[in-house]
């Protein structure tokens, strides 16, 4: 039995789950999420707890067992609390600002970079060196944060660029002056 897959998923009072043969819908105060289901897993709901079981012990069913348990858990967490990813900008003259619905980034290139987030994602810029990516879908929040980070990844010599909060940049030593 999968260590992750066998754990039950507690439902909060605010989250409601609807299960059909082919898909699953989780609704909460922050929104609604859908997930297509695979025939390798059986999902049941009783007494405010959702459980995931697999139909057999095939390799595919074992993989799907843990995966769907975590996906459903993330959906419940997302519609009740939401997810936030914080990005930090380091570098002289590097900054971010919101212009209309676009995130405008000045990252040392000869031009500004404009980024439009998907409708399900909210981007906030509390100050010029901090970006908050918020939404109910954990995968989409992470994907948007990774896309923003990819515009100027942190470089190892000075650490300039966009990094996740708490990310440790492995630093390199510069060339030693030879004599």
Swiss-Prot record:
InterPro entries xref list: Ribosomal_uL6-like (IPR000702), Ribosomal_uL6-like_a/b-dom_sf (IPR036789), Ribosomal_uL6_a/b-dom (IPR020040), Ribosomal_uL6_bac-type (IPR019906)
Gene Ontology terms describing biological process: cytoplasmic translation
Record's subunit section: Part of the 50S ribosomal subunit.
Membership in a protein family: Belongs to the universal ribosomal protein uL6 family.
Function: This protein binds to the 23S rRNA, and is important in its secondary structure. It is located near the subunit interface in the base of the L7/L12 stalk, and near the tRNA binding site of the peptidyltransferase center.
Keyword rRNA-binding (UniProt): yes
Keywords: Ribonucleoprotein, Ribosomal protein, RNA-binding, rRNA-binding
GO CC terms, sorted: cytosolic large ribosomal subunit
Pfam families in alphabetical order: Ribosomal_L6
UniProt-recorded name of the protein: Large ribosomal subunit protein uL6
PANTHER family linked: 60S/50S RIBOSOMAL PROTEIN L6/L9, LARGE RIBOSOMAL SUBUNIT PROTEIN UL6M
Any one GO molecular-function label of the UniProt entry: rRNA binding
